[in-house]
Amino acid sequence: MRARSGVRSALLLALLLCWDPTPSLAGVDSAGQVLPDSYPSAPAEQLPYFLLEPQDAYIVKNKPVELHCRAFPATQIYFKCNGEWVSQNDHVTQESLDEATGLRVREVQIEVSRQQVEELFGLEDYWCQCVAWSSSGTTKSRRAYIRIAYLRKNFDQEPLAKEVPLDHEVLLQCRPPEGVPVAEVEWLKNEDVIDPAQDTNFLLTIDHNLIIRQARLSDTANYTCVAKNIVAKRRSTTATVIVYVNGGWSSWAEWSPCSNRCGRGWQKRTRTCTNPAPLNGGAFCEGQAFQKTACTTVCPVDGAWTEWSKWSACSTECAHWRSRECMAPPPQNGGRDCSGTLLDSKNCTDGLCVLNQRTLNDPKSHPLETSGDVALYAGLVVAVFVVVAVLMAVGVIVYRRNCRDFDTDITDSSAALTGGFHPVNFKTARPNNPQLLHPSAPPDLTASAGIYRGPVYALQDSADKIPMTNSPLLDPLPSLKIKVYNSSTIGSGSGLADGADLLGVLPPGTYPGDFSRDTHFLHLRSASLGSQHLLGLPRDPSSSVSGTFGCLGGRLSLPGTGVSLLVPNGAIPQGKFYDLYLHINKAESTLPLSEGSQTVLSPSVTCGPTGLLLCRPVVLTVPHCAEVIAGDWIFQLKTQAHQGHWEEVVTLDEETLNTPCYCQLEAKSCHILLDQLGTYVFMGESYSRSAVKRLQLAIFAPALCTSLEYSLRVYCLEDTPVALKEVLELERTLGGYLVEEPKPLLFKDSYHNLRLSLHDIPHAHWRSKLLAKYQEIPFYHVWNGSQRALHCTFTLERHSLASTEFTCKVCVRQVEGEGQIFQLHTTLAETPAGSLDALCSAPGNAITTQLGPYAFKIPLSIRQKICSSLDAPNSRGNDWRLLAQKLSMDRYLNYFATKASPTGVILDLWEARQQDDGDLNSLASALEEMGKSEMLVAMATDGDC
């Protein structure tokens, strides 16, 4: 009340000073002369301008805060707090003169005490603002809010001690006490402040948690969460983290020698628990440190002589012989050989003949034996030389013959490449000649006849050879045609004719661009035959889409397939434009091989080009055919490396901070947040043989049948839009039509085959040509998911062309599992018009490329408000974490916590999920449950809820 009376008295005083009591007559001066109607007026004084405005302040304990205001030109400055004028006595005023302008500068100061702030009732904070007067009017300053600063003593959540194995992730949670201003949080490791910029193994999340990416032995320490603001500093209880190492066995040592050198014994081997040794309380190695086994060592047997043989007849040299062998027993198992001589001789004439009488063990007593050995060795040497000479002669003959054939093949391959031919001595190429690109097709003879004189591009280097394999090169290439030129037309650069399709397996079309011969072959030499080269080529429009995107983002979609790529706003750097594409790989060879109970659950999808810099994750959506039941599946995402082999990216529910992506699994699709573009496929592995795949069964028949035979094709496909679309396109080329709407079938991991059979055939007019009662598709053909258009054909025959009605039942079931029955009734004379065309040409969404704001359901202004409101951690948990929980995206929150805007990434994922819905109801419901009513008002104002 006193403040108001003071202000009134000040205003009254100002009015009295400005009031002139002297009356005056308009247009008459004091002498009675008529005055002019107007005088030149002085320039009007400007409105007050604030040089200093009051700033927000906090009252610490009982110390009042000072608020300052400075303005010019100003005759008066007063403070107004919470709508009431502050007493003039509480103002401290200073005046000065601005030397530059000569105007008077007025500065006012007041103090606000804790008591004044506490006496305020209501939800609004205590505020003050300045009001400055001049002769031209008044000006108000900004509002300055004054709050009582505090910091509670108790933490909402304190870190807990943990024992973790080496190289595992560690999460220490901390929720600081409530305070004004909001407390800043830092972590201490053994009383040293943790700086993630210096040690990247540490990560501080946006909600103040500490994450150790891979625990090291050096990370064993005491960790403390510290919260501080201008009032106080609080420390949490210390959490001790122990990084332990479980012991591991070393390799087994070699087996020791057998304990007995002869007969039965024992031998053992040992290992030590040192690979690694247990540390910090880690578990000791499980198992035995040594192994013992029985051994049997075969005893050695020494050789012994047999009895001497009888003496031989007396020879011309007056001697006879006898022999013995070391065979009683022979030496075995390392036993000693017999000692002594093999042969023995003596004079057989009782001394009548003494010529050359020597014993055989005398080396000089066998001159004939020595000469015989020399002759034998000489003969062997001569034989070796003869064999070598014959082999060399044969080799020379074969080499010359191969050279002639090779030269002819080179000539033929050059002619095939250049379009020319030889008028004489033309030899048909061998079918197995690897130098020819197209051995089974005749050369292109549209070029002028004669021998080609220009350079020959025979593609003989290893980098130029195009292998004839089932690699991904053969399937996606769209009609690579090679133009060939004669020497007479090289100068003009025009080709004479188009060559045959490369490898003879490509669909019709032309190679992009108008290349000359040299440029084209240079491209073949420099380009890689891997996936990166193929991605630049034109593709089937039904399985490929591309677009140019900037920083505003957009969406690529393949209609009728469930495959899309969402590029969020800000994912592409400012000022850059990327040509992005999305492609479904149809070839079976582009799918990874299934091992064990693994199965391919989605199509192989390529988004590219790879290696682009992305500022935030993009969202790739692919359909899958898994019946999602918790605990039945082990899901994996795999990517194709540059060498063509597949590598695991992530196993769901086993993510760590180093995982480069996040998978949001829905009932029939999977949304993948990616930092890198590439080729991806979603796979699953049955856990304890309880997993179930969703299949769809489709029956096709010929649209027009003019013969007695009639066939039914029963397809067993993965329950994805991609699989059905491929079969519809295939049947359209075969002239078939869909007899009945596809039906679902649950296929269990039970090793049981899929059985198909026909029933209730009208035998009076039809008969089945199938000898057996049923057909079966092996379990692994269905389960692995890598075989496209899997089907069985039932061939029937009608007795006459007059039989145009056909009815039967088709039963498809898994042995000891579920099944489906089709009741068919068709008229052969009626051709269903356009049934497949309607299915193939009417996808759920015909738009393939959406750019900028048109691709998103949430307007950018609403998105920014939601992010600014939910990104900051809230002690009540009413932030992005609760939003993720409400939207069922909280499977691994640490992925979002590492992003600059967790809310933005969650909204990107929501955008990918809501591609077909097109409204904001689910998001609005989540925000309403969170109590974010101001966001609902913004959505109702700016959006189209």
Swiss-Prot record:
**Positions marked as site (Cleavage):** D412, S413
Topology class, membrane: Single-pass type I membrane protein
Residue positions of S-palmitoyl cysteine lipidation?
Answer: C403
| Region of interest (UPA domain), residue spans | 689-838
Chain ranges passing through the membrane: 378-398
An example of a GO molecular function for this protein is: netrin receptor activity
Stretch list, region Interaction with DCC: 707-725
Gene Ontology annotations for the cellular component aspect, listed alphabetically: cytosol; membrane raft; plasma membrane
Q: What happens when the gene is disrupted?
A: Complete embryonic lethality, due to defects in blood vessel development that lead to heart failure. Mutant embryos display increased branching of the internal carotid artery and of blood vessels in the nervous system, including thinner and more highly branched brain capillaries. Endothelial tip cells present an increased number of filopodia.
Q: What is its main location?
A: membrane
Domain called Ig-like: residue spans: 48-145
Q: Please verify whether the record's keywords include Lipoprotein.
A: yes
Q: Which GO terms describe its biological process?
A: angiogenesis; anterior/posterior axon guidance; apoptotic process; axon guidance; negative regulation of extrinsic apoptotic signaling pathway in absence of ligand; negative regulation of neuron apoptotic process; positive regulation of phosphatidylinositol 3-kinase/protein kinase B signal transduction
**SUPFAM superfamilies in the record, alphabetically?**
DEATH domain, Immunoglobulin, TSP-1 type 1 repeat
Where does the record place the Ig-like C2-type domain?
Answer: 153-242
Q: Which residues carry this modification: Phosphotyrosine?
A: Y581
Residue ranges that the UniProt entry lists as topological domain Extracellular: 27-377
Q: Residues in domain ZU5?
A: 543-686
Q: Which PANTHER family match?
A: NETRIN RECEPTOR UNC5 (PTHR12582), NETRIN RECEPTOR UNC5B (PTHR12582:SF6)
Family the UniProt entry places it in: Belongs to the unc-5 family.
What is known about what this protein does? Receptor for netrin required for axon guidance. Mediates axon repulsion of neuronal growth cones in the developing nervous system upon ligand binding. Axon repulsion in growth cones may be caused by its association with DCC that may trigger signaling for repulsion. Functions as a netrin receptor that negatively regulates vascular branching during angiogenesis. Mediates retraction of tip cell filopodia on endothelial growth cones in response to netrin. It also acts as a dependence receptor required for apoptosis induction when not associated with netrin ligand.
Q: What is this protein called?
A: Netrin receptor UNC5B
Q: Which organism is it from?
A: Mus musculus
